[in-house]
Amino acid sequence: MAARRRHVAAGAGAPAPAAGEWAAVTAGGGAAWALSPVEEVGTKQELMRRTGLPPRDLRALDPALSSAASASSCRPSAITGRDRAVVVNLDRARAVITASEVLVPSPRDPAVAPLVRELRARLALAASPTPAPSPSPPQHGMAVGMDGSISPSQASRGGEEAAGNGKDGEALGGGDKALPFEFRALEVCLEFACKSLEHETCTLEKEAYPALDELTSKVSTLNLERVRQIKSRLVAISGKVQKVRDELEHLLDDDMDMAALHLTEKLAYQSSRFDIDKEASELEDHSSRDEEGVEGGGGGDGDDETIAGGGSFSPNTDELEILLESYFVQIDGTLNSLSTLREYVEDTEDYINMMLDEKQNQLLQMGILLSTGTLVSSCAIAVTGVFGINVHISLYDSPASSAAFPCAAAGIVAGSLALYLAALLCYKRAGILQ
């Protein structure tokens, strides 16, 4: 009771979304809110029974841990197939997909709410228009042990329900084979993740190209700071897009991982295996009671073992492969756009560096000119100082002494200019000055 009061008080005082809320979107498009705080062991165990997921998968979808990982730019992207569920963790698209429903954490988060609305709209559109009872959650249709395994009897009922949903989908499509529920939900998650990353990329491009062009025309502290922020965002978005692309590429390269995503066929396969094993057991009991001959009983058992043990779960992954390839092409195009923008940023940086080098060369040339002028002026001052010594010479007594001063001054100035021009000529011949 105390834990419940604390939770209600915290939820009533802050409008922010609670970290333990989950939205359950069923095959008919309906959504139900389910409070599942991580700190309450009972509710967490209920989620584990409902989805058959280990605790580490639920922790990976924890919004608090995801926010911390996103802030440190190390948030993983993964599509993992488990026994009864598919864990989707692609940037903002985080969900647990079962054969009959989709569980989305933190549905009131403004970044996640569009995903919930899209799931409700798309799944409701794909559902049968005839009124039918919504499929029961996995915890009511299947019994889960401590290790997450499914009991054969409940797996049989789950497989029949999943097969029924598949038939309804085929009837909707007018004879065309419809995608299973988990593929439709996965498609919505992939589309949401790709569109959100594409939207971020387009927004960044609209801000980046004008800022880079302005920087090339005018290098200032404000423009440099804008470009620095744009480059930081570019690195962050490129990392997220690259992780999603790598995950899709990994799935396309691994048929076993793609086979693990076929939840509906997996349930139907488990149901058929259970029926075969049950028939084999009944036939064995009947043979042992009615026939006492070893040869007849052994032959019958061998045939049953061949039926029961032959083959393994290997679904046709063509539909899933086509689905993943379409979004792989889309996310690869987004990555190419980011690569083009990165090249444009690098070209702009090279251009700015060339401009700065040119300015630096001009400053160095100006320093050489000033240093040479200072040297020539020092020489002229030294000559003037020599003539300024108070020593009596015959020039003072000469009648032309009145004209000697301007001639000496003009000679010093002319000599200084000639020496300066000679130094400049030597610099140009040596290639120091342009």
Curated annotation (Swiss-Prot):
Record GO terms (molecular function): magnesium ion transmembrane transporter activity
Bilayer topology: Multi-pass membrane protein
Pfam families assigned to the protein according to its UniProt record, in alphabetical order: MRS2-like
Keyword field: Ion transport, Magnesium, Membrane, Transmembrane, Transmembrane helix, Transport
Annotated segments matching region Disordered: 126-171, 279-311
Superkingdom classification of source: Eukaryota
Biased composition (Basic and acidic residues): 279-291
Keyword Ion transport: yes
GO cellular component, one term: membrane
Protein family per UniProt: Belongs to the CorA metal ion transporter (MIT) (TC 1.A.35.5) family.
PANTHER family: MAGNESIUM TRANSPORTER MRS2-D-RELATED, RNA SPLICING PROTEIN MRS2, MITOCHONDRIAL
Protein name, as recorded: Putative magnesium transporter MRS2-D
Organism field: Oryza sativa subsp. japonica (Rice)
Name of encoding gene: MRS2-D
